[in-house]
Amino acid sequence: MDRTPVTHTATDRTLGHFPSGRDVSVTVHRYEGGPGPTVFVQAAQHGIELNGPAALRRLHARLVDAEIAGTVVAVPVANPLAFDHRSYLTPEAYDAFNSNFNRIWPGDGDGSFQERLVANIWPLVEAADAAIDLHTGMPEMLEHVRFR
């Protein structure tokens, strides 16, 4: 695979709308190099997990001037509702049935508020050859990695 200089784009992806009509959106970064696989990486499904967005900021600093084969698609804050409320779960005022963003993949375009939000991120995951979901544990947790 040939590595080529990265072309970086950042776009807002609308996931849904508040009852007021305001958009709920996430920022999607694309780092496109030469031909090759696509990797999707996201962070902050839980709003108090801050290490993932920080790690993606560091990754951005390395990728923006790099030469790579393939594409990296990054969503630093997958759940802006929980993130903006500094809450592990999405506040129940938004979705009393599905407050844990991480438990409702791949979402449902006709489902609850959060299921609809997740359903609008899912195409990015589906289009990738590999997907990485970054989480942060509490200090007393044992370190672990899960993969499928």
Say what each PLM segment does.
Residues 1-148:
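Structured catalytic-domain cores with a bias toward divalent-metal coordination
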